[in-house]
Amino acid sequence: MSKDVFTAVGVGADVGRVLGRLSRVVARKSTLPSLSCVKLWVDDSGSDLWAAASSLDQWYEAKLPVELQDGHPGAGCLVRIDLLSSLLAQCNGDGVEMVSADGRISLNAQGRKATIQTLPISEFPTGPAAGDPAAIGEVDGSAIAAALDRVAFAVSKDETRYILNGALFNEDGDAVVATDGRRLALAKVELPECLRDVVLPTPSLGVFSDLWSRSGFCKVFAADSGIGVRGDDEMVWTKKIEGRYPNYKQVIPAYEDFAELKMDREVFEESLRWVAAVGNATEKERGRTATLQVEGAALRVSARAVEVGESEERVPLSDPPQGAMQVAASMDFLREMSHAAGEESLVLRVDPGPDGKVSSPIVCEAEGGRFIGIVMPMRVA
């Protein structure tokens, strides 16, 4: 019997949905044809059809929602995942039959037919090892996913500082951290031993977060210089970023004498969106800066772009601080930090200094310190 022979029947949209998740780890620019493919194979029980995608640095496998009608254990093939996903998406929810044999896979769906050439299953890279049983822990996936989502905005995009191109699961086992040197975000969450002092790379953040949020309590394991997560009928794995993460604790100021700016979070974010209409009209970074100035019981939020114009809005403050105060910072950084804080009321802590011009970090705390956001200010003209 040919090694690629199997027949399976399922709903095109359901199968396509699973392949859509797997496609997030496919290597887009690889010269290896196999890495642009999805691996389809019959599992050892001979009763289920599985699929896997890989970029060598990442691996994602899942059981497909199909009924296997024919196929012996190990039978399988490689198919271009973009083409297969596109065809399945056009099955309009109708049942689709997938038949693999003789270097081709055929799709039959309510009169629609297509045949795609396949590659031998042997050309696909080997998946990660199962890992040391002692290095396996159980986590509350939804809690970790929520923490990751809150800090992801602060991950560095500067590839020359590779250690910052991901989120840190801290050594203390109680927080997820991300920073790009100009801002920092920390979210408290309980971590198992195998996740401590691990930097999860940026390409894997969304994939892991999605699986964690859908799986609830699930297994995490360390294997092959990487980290993996096992959910219900699926598994994702990624290489870790090797290196020493900067001491982020030194960046978090412990202000003894500080001023608090308390306001409605959504109103503040709306004001930033308003001034961004002018600020974002220029390519210069200075034009994308928001200036925050305390004026009585309100916070004046403004932006000015040379040769473009200026905009402002006043945001009411509850219990406004005494005296004049002014600080400038990236409007995007402020808005993202505010959104991650999540609470109805936003509190920003600043050290105004003797002249009222803030030059030290802007600190945002929410949920009793379970979220901390920091934005470095810009020089006030």
Please identify what each model-predicted range represents:
Residues 1-381:
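Structural preference for solvent-exposed beta-strand-turn elements
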